[in-house]
Amino acid sequence: MAHVPDCDPEEDHEKLETDKYAFYVNFVRDQGDALEIAEKYREEKGIQSIILCPGFTNEEVGELSETLDDVSVNVARGDGPSGRIAQEAMQKAGWFE
């Protein structure tokens, strides 16, 4: 799941799968969208884990973890330089406007 300010969570999603694994990707605008989509995926698709983009704050990760108590909640974070590079790229793209 990734924060994308100009997305439509109901439209901006995809599923990749093999015979043994299903991987769902969903863009969300904010924490409200994230909670709604995550609960929907747990109930309708039976997800067992979720991977969040680095844009989720520790507080948001905690809230998702509390809400999805039976789902593993993980965050894809890089090292210090990677975070800075990603932040600069997002700023150039107008992410924070």
Spell out what each predicted region is.
Residues G55-F56, R77-P81:
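Short, ordered loop/turn segments at secondary-structure junctions
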Residues Q48-L52:
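Short catalytic-loop micro-motif centered on adjacent basic/acidic residues
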Residues E36-E44:
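Short, well-structured alpha-helical segments in soluble
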Residues L16-D33:
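Glycine-rich phosphate-binding "P-loop"
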Residues M1-D8:
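N-terminal basic/disordered segments at the start of proteins
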Residues A86, A93-E97:
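C-terminal binding/interaction regions
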Residues V61-D79:
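Alpha-helix-loop-beta-strand connector modules within alpha/beta enzyme cores
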